[in-house]
A protein has these predicted regions:
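PLD/PLD-like phosphodiesterase catalytic module centered on the HKD motif
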Residues: 1-44, 48-170
């Protein structure tokens, strides 16, 4: 899939149920491209470790690069960022460059399966409810956006800073 295939605006983003790793990956690619095209000011992504997200793909980091303008903010919530470092080096490089707009938080409470796998934006959301089958829902509905944002805000309140952009040594 290339940038031409991706949605030009958030109204073209899928709504309803999704299922399977391919559909899940495409959903993330489309969402980041829509964020770049529409200038979404805030994005929150949450997952236990982001291992199966396509964060390191050229299309995603390119869309994030296009999205990275004044006044933007990406918040990441995860239990562990080891998989991001190991599987998504292109994203790690992007994150280091844009560390001033990327906040990474660690969630240490409860088992990892209780941490939602989701993306929240002011315009659109998705949540993966079945991690094994990569199945969940996406949409623009205000009630879903509000409910997901409230749940993620609760996680943020209990989180700690994590995944520093640089590691300073002695």
């Amino acid at each position: 899939m290339n940038a031409v295939d991706l949605a030009a605006d958030d109204s073209a983003l899928p709504e309803g149920r999704f299922s399977g790793r391919t559909e899940f990956g495409n959903l993330i690619r489309q969402a980041f491209q829509a964020a770049a095209n529409q200038g979404w000011r805030e994005i929150i992504i949450c997952d236990a470790d982001f291992e199966d997200w396509p964060l390191g793909e050229r299309a995603v980091t390119s869309a994030l690069g296009d999205w990275s303008r004044t006044g933007r903010k990406l918040t990441m919530i995860a239990r562990n960022y080891d998989a991001v470092t190991r599987r998504h080096p292109r994203f790690v490089t992007w994150r280091q460059t844009w560390s001033h707009i990327v906040e990474c938080r660690g969630s240490a409470s409860g088992p990892s399966d209780t941490l939602p796998s989701a993306m929240w934006t002011p315009n659109w959301v998705f949540e993966r409810l079945d991690l094994e089958r990569s199945a969940g829902y996406s949409g623009h509905e205000a009630a879903r956006r509000v409910a997901l944002k409230e749940g993620l805000n609760e996680r943020l309140l209990k989180s700690i800073p994590a995944f520093p952009a640089t590691t300073l040594g002695l």
